Amino acid sequence: MRLGDGATRFTTDLDIARASAIDDFSEQLAGSLAAGWEGFTGALVEERQAHPKGVPSQYVMQPFSVKPLYNGKPWVTVDLEVGHNEIGDADEPDFVSPEDANAVLENLGFPPLGPIPVMALRHQIAQKLHAVSAPSSMRAHDLIDLQLLDKAYEGDYSDVRETCMRLFAYRKMQAWPPTIAGGAEWETAYADQLPSGDLILNVSDAISWANSLIGRIDAAR
């Protein structure tokens, strides 16, 4: 949403961080979906939470299915993954105008949306670095996201370093600074999700770039 459709990796789900208790969040979201907007309504369905081996339960996202309707007719299902507010990542969002979505809405005769809260880039970078550097990580696609996020980030790396140190300490898994090693299936996974644009073309070079990024972040004071 921050970078636009043409400059991001395609994904079919939506990840968000909640600033309230999960029951309060789901109740408020379900109410908003029922109230609707411009003929759109929806239903919220809680799905079974995964229990991946070696991952503490407090770090596992709570999945939901969002089932939108237009004038009472279903037309799509959106997979929603809801995380909790680990180190304040939901407390200080950036607000961005969804220009691509607004262009589509206006072409269809709907009013544009106002600014939407999105996670601050320093938190996104920290979370991606933690996920992609985890032991036995299967998240080669995070290397793509990190390149896009780094291009968009205009702040001082010292802020990113402080956020990374806090997140890695909070999750108590691998230590900061980590080293990204890659995996057996990363080459195919990376190539399959690589969008067009000025990005690194092969996974080995992307891993080297990401480890260099970690070094630059850790050196910032």
Question: Whereabouts are the PLM-identified features?
Answer:
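Periplasmic plug
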Residues: T12
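Acidic Asp/Glu-based divalent-cation binding sites
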Residues: D15
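Structured mid-to-C-terminal alpha-helical surface segments
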Residues: R2-T8, R18-R221
